[in-house]
Swiss-Prot record:
One of its GO terms (molecular function) is ribose-5-phosphate isomerase activity. Belongs to the ribose 5-phosphate isomerase family. Pfam families: Rib_5-P_isom_A. It is an enzyme of class 5 (isomerase). The active site is at E104. InterPro entries: NagB/RpiA_transferase-like, Ribose-5P_isomerase, Ribose5P_isomerase_typA_subgr, Ribose5P_isomerase_type_A. GO terms for biological process: pentose-phosphate shunt, non-oxidative branch. Homodimer. This is Ribose-5-phosphate isomerase A. Substrate binds at T26, G27, S28, T29, D82, G83, A84, D85, K95, G96, G97, G98, K122. Keywords: Isomerase. The lineage of its organism: Bacteria, Bacillati, Bacillota, Bacilli, Lactobacillales.
């Protein structure tokens, strides 16, 4: 599995050219993309500026001497490469297993090209087997939790080391055990209207390319948005 993730990450790095502003994703597959960018800077003299999607990725990038700016210091991002927890046949996805979904979406939105790197196990016909992360402000988080309980969404507060997990933006995450999401676009819109919800892990019709590493090698699929 790690080899597949590495293959996908290295393939994605081939899309990066001198002079680009590059969004560096977060997670186990995006990790290999960031490592390959660091190698290319060191060995090939690749010249880029990067923005990151989490404190974890920032630390990794700094260790590789990748030049960084904040998202507010750039007008746009040429290419962002990130992982995904599930990807359906309509190029909708669930992200946020690593807890960085808000920053990931903030960086993805001004990106001219948005690429996901995944192994083939992440491809699904319908989203929902992976718990859907919802980032909520700490104030009133219990109210949001009870709202999700009443709706039958089987919520749980994400925890780390016995405490509630706190994101880089100092919010909580409520994971929803939905089993299947029949209409991701409509459900995303529903979540957008829940007071106290900052962002959710549905990335609907945002991605341009999906790089999938499997037993038969690497395949690149392009969405309607990316064509």
């Amino acid at each position: 599995m790690e080899n597949l993730k590495k293959m996908a990450g290295i393939t994605a790095a081939e899309f990066i050219k001198d002079g680009m502003v590059v969004g560096l994703g977060t997670g186990s597959t995006a990790y290999y993309f960031v490592e390959e960018i660091g190698r290319r800077i060191k060995e090939e003299g690749l010249q880029i500026t990067a923005v990151t999607t989490s404190s974890v990725t920032s630390k990794q990038a700094e260790g590789l001497n990748i030049p960084l700016k904040s998202i507010d210091q750039v007008d746009f991002v040429d290419v962002t490469v990130d992982g995904a927890d599930e990807v359906d046949s309509q190029f909708n996805g669930i992200k946020g297993g690593g807890g960085a979904l808000l920053m990931e979406k903030v960086v993805a939105t001004p990106s001219k090209e948005y690429i996901w790197v995944v192994d083939e196990s992440k491809l699904v016909e319908k989203l929902g087997a992976f718990k859907l992360p919802v980032e909520v402000v700490q104030y009133g988080a219990e109210q949001v939790f009870r709202h999700f309980e009443r709706a039958g969404y089987k919520p749980s507060f994400r925890e780390k080391d016995g405490q509630r997990f706190v994101t880089d933006m100092q919010n909580f995450i409520i994971d929803l055990a939905l089993d299947v999401i029949e209409n991701p676009i409509a459900f995303g819109q529903e979540l957008d209207h829940v007071v106290g919800v900052v962002e959710h892990g549905l990335f609907n019709q945002m991605v341009d390319k999906v790089i999938v590493a499997g037993r038969d090698g690497v395949q690149i699929s392009t969405s309607k948005k990316g064509k």
